[in-house]
C-alpha cells in the first residue's frame, strides 16, 4: 500500500517526526497512534475502510521508531505536544 503522503516533519526543538497519510485526502482527519512494536505504516491496513468512510488517517511514528528522532527520558505526557505540533504543521 502506497501512502497518500510519507514525509518527515521537523519539530520546533529540531526533532524529526516521520508520518504517513492514508485514506481520503480530503476526508475528516484522524490521528492514528500506533502501539509498540509497530510504526506509522500499520495504518495501511485501514486505508480501504478510511477511503470508504471519508476519513484521512495521519499516522506519525513515535519517538525512536523508524525515522523519528529518539527522545532520551521521554514520558507519555510528551506525546500530546508532539501530535499537536504535527496537527499545526498540517493546518488541522
Task: List PLM regions with ranges.
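An N-terminal hydrophobic leader/cap segment in hydrolases
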Residues: 1-8
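A general secondary-structure boundary signal
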Residues: 8, 20-26, 84, 88
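Conserved HGGG/HGGXW glycine-rich cap/lid loop of the alpha/beta-hydrolase fold
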Residues: 15-67
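Cap/lid segment of the alpha/beta-hydrolase catalytic domain
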Residues: 59, 63-81
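Conserved acidic catalytic loop of the alpha/beta-hydrolase fold
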Residues: 78-92
